[in-house]
Every structure is written in C-alpha cells, then in structure tokens.
Amino acid sequence: MTPELNLKSLGAKTPYIFEYNSQLLEAFPNPNPNLDPLITLECKEFTSLCPITSQPDFGVIFIRYIPKDKMVESKSLKLYLFSYRNHGSFHESCINTILLDLVRLLEPKYLEVYGDFASRGGIAIKPFVNYAIKEYQDFKEKRLLNAK
C-alpha cells in the first residue's frame, strides 16, 4: 500500500494558471534519502515575457538536483513553470527565482537551474545558477566551472 502523499495536482483536473505562482509547487518524501541520485528535469517549452517589450521569450529549462528528504512532484513543476507564461521577467531573474523557489520547497543537498533561451537579436542568453549545502560545496564549484 502506498503512503498518503497529500498531492493536489497529480490525478486531478488541471486548471492552467499563466501568472507566476510558486504555491503550485509540491513535494513528496524521498523514498531513498540515503542515496545521492543526480536527478535531471527538462522543460522544453518554457515561456515568459520580456519585461520591457512584452514580447514572448522561449527557452528550455534544465533543473538538476540531489534530493535530501523531499523530491519535487513533476506535474506541479510543470504547472509552476507554465505559470511564467504571462510573467514579465528577464531570463536571469526567471532562473534565479526558479532556483530559490525549489530550494525553499525541497531543501536539497544540491540544485542547479540552467536556461537555454532562444536567440533574440542574434544573441542567446544561457543563465546558470546553483546551490549546495555545506557538504556539497566542492561539487557546486565543479559544476559551476563546467556549466553549459
């Protein structure tokens, strides 16, 4: 028998919200907290708005993390990332906010967010940000040096 996870999004009718909302994120207990898997999540259809021109920006968001006690529920992550659709923010700010929201929710051992945004005016912006608890600082520094 599976434990009660108290998830609101998974298996329910999906109301799509297109205004930034960190409350959409949900987590569940890590079933193997003694292991250190590096989990990769990829959102191939991330969209937000330029805060100056209100033009849409498109990108691929890569989230990698080593969980501690909690893991992100993937449908809630999808809904959360969709909530940026009409949100006006620079690429770098989006990536920083995603990291901060996930760190607040999960309290992971390690987490990184990388955005591969479509070129605009011939320039592609590819922000990277990462976080680590004290025991994973060396890993964080190595990942930062080898960021895409």
Curated annotation (Swiss-Prot):
Q: Which UniProt keywords apply?
A: Cytoplasm, NADP, Oxidoreductase, Queuosine biosynthesis
Q: What subcellular compartments does it reside in?
A: Cytoplasm
* UniProt binding sites for substrate: V72, E73, S74, H91, E92
Involved pathway(s): tRNA modification; tRNA-queuosine biosynthesis
Q: Name one GO cellular component term.
A: cytosol
Q: Which InterPro entries match?
A: GTP-CH-I_C/QueF, NADPH_dep_7-cyano-7-deazaG_red, QueF, QueF_type1
List the catalytic residues: C50, D57
Identify the EC number(s): 1.7.1.13
Key word Cytoplasm present in the record?
Answer: yes
Question: What processes in GO biological process is this protein linked to?
Answer: queuosine biosynthetic process; tRNA modification
Instruction: Please list the reactions this protein catalyses.
Output: 7-aminomethyl-7-carbaguanine + 2 NADP(+) = 7-cyano-7-deazaguanine + 2 NADPH + 3 H(+)
Q: Does the keyword Cytoplasm apply?
A: yes
Top-level division of the source organism's lineage: Bacteria
GO MF: preQ1 synthase activity
Q: Which family does it belong to?
A: Belongs to the GTP cyclohydrolase I family. QueF type 1 subfamily.
List the PANTHER family: NADPH-DEPENDENT 7-CYANO-7-DEAZAGUANINE REDUCTASE
Q: What is this protein called?
A: NADPH-dependent 7-cyano-7-deazaguanine reductase
Q: Which gene encodes it?
A: queF
